[in-house]
Every structure is written in C-alpha cells, then in structure tokens.
Curated annotation (Swiss-Prot):
The lineage of its organism: Eukaryota, Viridiplantae, Streptophyta, Embryophyta, Tracheophyta. It comes from Cuscuta reflexa (Southern Asian dodder). PANTHER family: PHOTOSYSTEM II REACTION CENTER PROTEIN M (PTHR35774:SF1). The keyword Membrane applies. It is a single-pass membrane protein. GO terms for biological process: photosynthesis, light reaction. It is found in: Plastid membrane. This is Photosystem II reaction center protein M. The chain crosses the membrane at residues 5-25. One of the components of the core complex of photosystem II (PSII). PSII is a light-driven water:plastoquinone oxidoreductase that uses light energy to abstract electrons from H(2)O, generating O(2) and a proton gradient subsequently used for ATP formation. It consists of a core antenna complex that captures photons, and an electron transfer chain that converts photonic excitation into a charge separation. This subunit is found at the monomer-monomer interface. The gene is psbM. Keywords: Membrane, Photosynthesis, Photosystem II, Plastid, Reaction center, Transmembrane, Transmembrane helix.
Amino acid sequence: MEVNILAFIATALLILVPTAFLLIIYVKTAS
C-alpha cells in the first residue's frame, strides 16, 4: 500500500495548526 505523502502532510497540518493555535492562545492567557 503506497503512502500518499501529500495526504500525510495535509493530515499533519490539519492536526498541528489548530494545536499550535490553541497552545498560543493558552500561553497568552496564562501569562
């Protein structure tokens, strides 16, 4: 089974971007 690199990157971005966004908001709120 071939791994679709573009699909993998898209999935990674879909997970990482909101996570980073929430982390930034949390840090700004905490400090």
